[in-house]
Amino acid sequence: MFKYIFKGIPFLLLLIPNLVLAEKLTILHINDHHSHLEANSRMGLDLDGESTRTKSGGFPAVVTKIKELRSENPNSLTLHAGDATNGTLYFTLFEGEADAALMNVVCFDAFVVGNHEFNNGDQGLVTFLDYLNEGNCQTPVLGANVQPEVGISPLAKSSRDDYIQPYTIVERNGEKIGIIGIVISKKTKMSSNPDDNTMFLDEVSTAQKYTDELNSQGVDRVILLSHFGYENDLALAQKTSGIDIIVGGDSHSLLGDLSDLGLKPSGSYPTMVNDASGNDVCVVTAWEYSQIVGELHAEFDGQGNITSCMGTPHMMLADSFKRKNADGERVEIEEGYRDAVYSVIKVNPSLSIVEPDADAQALLAGYSSKIDEFSSKIIGSVSEDLCLERIPGQGKSKMCDPSKTAKNGSDISNIVAQAFREMSNLSDIAIQNGGGTRVDVAAGDYTLGDAYTLLPFNNTIVELSMTGQEIK
């Protein structure tokens, strides 16, 4: 009886051509690691109802998690949504070599250039991409709206696609998938340092143009690998048609059900919106600094439309958990409390204790030993904690209560601006953008490494003559 029923199912599918099994795709992704190759040793989480200090992420832990998820999903895509470089001494000293070496352990299926990839001009980006191309991965580098001048820019000595291409097409489970890359345009031109003749086109119209081009080639499963920011991605999705998934970066947005950990997510993982034609679009991004690996599972119908999206932002933790004792010192928690923390981690799908990949860790050690020697020199002392806030009272400082910055803004940013003014004998004022200073500064000895972590970008101080009316 049963064998005839099962024999009849393929025959039934032939009679009903529109009855097609859902196609599944898994995407693993990171973004904005900004040369943060080591673990964050100051991650604060609420675990079992108490504030707990742990270590999170680091690129060797990213490698471990991606290997684990790939073994569970053999046909997955692995994507990087930009700003791989700039932000720590790993870039300052090695100009992208260390980042490229660790990225080539993963072998990403595509990488979109971010705005900070242009901080050292087109030639600086070429240097990084040459390192990236030294390995066996040959990761496609995307940027559909990046227009280097052919014959002038080192990015385009012979053609516009010498280093950066608008999209790549991959195949998974017998289906072609187009991956388009875009980078935030105005911000890159205004706050980074691309060559003067390198242009950046409108993000929305560029994304639509290449989606249409892929569709005309019969590719109707389209991923936008976007370094445009979470809110911008949501808006872009609603203004365009034909994009199925947006894997984003730039805004350092944390997504997922993580508020119980004391974190402040910007939205759900994934976030679902409708495009201009009413079709579903999945939007994801994976926070910052090698601390989260996103795992997105999408399903398509026979026409290439999204029917389902679900996933998990994975935060990788070290097996180290500290809390303040009666003297205010952070110490490793005792066994009974540790078991309670383990129980919290076990039931939270976003948390896992991850051992760094040994090969990646050994590779990183070759660079970190040189950094340790350079950065350990003490150059001063700090008498009190100095808060970092881009917006007064925003509450993103990892060290200070928002009330401390609500009136006068970021302590350390103001001090940096004052230092710039004092360096110039002629200046009446100095302006420092809030995003140019990157970390809180703790009281105590201050090292050369601390200074580079605070001000990691190769910016140039310039003097301008302006009227008071011109300054806004």
Annotated model-derived regions:
Residues 11, 196, 460:
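Generic anion/oxyanion-binding catalytic loop in active/binding sites
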Residues 22-320, 411-419, 430, 465:
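Acidic, metal/ion-coordinating pockets
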Residues 16-17:
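N-terminal signal peptide c-region/cleavage motif recognized by signal peptidases
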Residues 25-28, 53-57, 70-73, 215-217, ...:
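Non-catalytic terminal accessory segments
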Residues 1-9:
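Bacterial N-terminal signal peptides that target proteins for export
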